[in-house]
């Protein structure tokens, strides 16, 4: 059994208080992906509806529903548990002598949820779309050095940069750079179609979004049959939902509420350091 782990942040409040945001999950639930066992069980988690009516399933937009897109769509490259860049939909990659061109070989036999094949044209479409000024994607900075993506063949792409960049593959681990079917930009916000382990059965940003296991997932069918992502805007209500069994996991719990779960054998508190940081902006034209 693998327990869900989530990110942990520290930030200052009123110059003195440190708030630790902690995620809790039920110990007894199996959430590991496994092709050895049939998909079974329903896992329920919450989101805060932070983008309101603009909440959608398009990973490159400001209103993306993070909890869903990470389960329905894949990237080319990801980080493993040690933080090392590793293959996802790209099997391997290499740069030229001055690191201004990067060639990525793509995984073969991968299909989108609509049954279409994943190929190099989808990669070019998905990533160049991030640069579209009409979309105004918050992720466009990750693609700012890319001037062109050449489709070498059906499962090879060459990305051309405007400068040398030895760590370019690391940029592609950006959680927003997900692969979608070529030409699906107008509908992806509602369908969420990708190559991931779960398929969107029903999208309801203000209610419950239902995901079903993808039996044809390229890493093997997930261990869960369904995931329900429930909108609960109020933080206190999310904690109560966890305590009463309405949800199985809450990604962030204020430090002051951590004591509710300490010593409770039904819950596991996972504190996971990350590279995230929070800045505090201060005026410099007036005295403290």
Where are these regions (language model features)?
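Surface-exposed binding/hinge segments that line
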Residues: 18, 37, 105, 139-181
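Short, well-ordered beta-strand elements
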Residues: 41-49, 101-104, 123-126, 157-158, ...
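N-terminal lobe/hinge region of extracytoplasmic solute-binding protein
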Residues: 46-97, 128, 193-194
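Gly/Pro-rich hinge or "lid" segments in bacterial periplasmic/extracellular proteins
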Residues: 172-222, 226, 236
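Ligand-site clamp/hinge motif
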Residues: 186, 215-260, 275
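A bilobed periplasmic-binding-protein/Venus flytrap-type ligand-binding module shared by bacterial periplasmic
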Residues: 212-215, 274-288
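Ligand-binding "clamshell"
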Residues: 259-271
